[in-house]
Amino acid sequence: MAQTAMSETYDFLFKFLVIGNAGTGKSCLLHQFIEKKFKDDSNHTIGVEFGSKIINVGGKYVKLQIWDTAGQERFRSVTRSYYRGAAGALLVYDITSRETYNALTNWLTDARMLASQNIVLILCGNKKDLDADREVTFLEASRFAQENELMFLETSALTGENVEEAFMQCARKILNKIESGELDPERMGSGIQYGDAALRQLRSPRRTQAPSAQECGC
């Protein structure tokens, strides 16, 4: 029992999204990150799927609540409602499909309009293991990321390459913004929550108490 309680202890909770066209491997990325194995029987997500994991980011324990959204157009109205209050997102395309790459601008627009004002985004070129079938070069995607102020990695849900790093980089940047004061977990819709009431109290400015009549020497 004590071990379970310890495993659920965390300093912050971040709401994450995984977005992009259908067939890009979003569900497989989520499964690889949480279970450390490839989900080879994955079907297209219908609506939204959910997963969570606690990670250690620079000595802070962060619980990621991750919403894997359907990529088909007919589910867009449903999945858009889950954007609200997201602190971070993986924007996923398939390196073997230019169609999924060309759709990135629409996904990016949705994320920045509907999610948290300061949402942190990382671009993930998935299916890196299929390099021989590549339709989108690393350089082209890297330029897109730079132009749109995104972090960028190529990933493989099959081999696990860069999967954990993608989530870690995104979480690390959010944590850095909290520590610098750029992000305020107290702000409604930030997609961030304190995981411990004591930590929240420590990070809140201490109120100056007025001296009592006995202390003031009146």
Curated annotation (Swiss-Prot):
Annotated GO MF terms: G protein activity; GDP binding; GTP binding; GTPase activity
Residues recorded with modification Cysteine methyl ester: 218
InterPro entries: P-loop_NTPase, Rab4, Rab_GTPases_membrane_traffic, Small_GTP-bd, Small_GTPase
Keywords, sorted A to Z: Cytoplasm, Endosome, GTP-binding, Hydrolase, Lipoprotein, Magnesium, Membrane, Metal-binding, Methylation, Nucleotide-binding, Phosphoprotein, Prenylation, Protein transport, Transport
Family: Belongs to the small GTPase superfamily. Rab family.
Record remark: domains: Switch 1, switch 2 and the interswitch regions are characteristic of Rab GTPases and mediate the interactions with Rab downstream effectors. The switch regions undergo conformational changes upon nucleotide binding which drives interaction with specific sets of effector proteins, with most effectors only binding to GTP-bound Rab.
Protein name: Ras-related protein Rab-4A
Species in which this protein is naturally found: Mus musculus (Mouse)
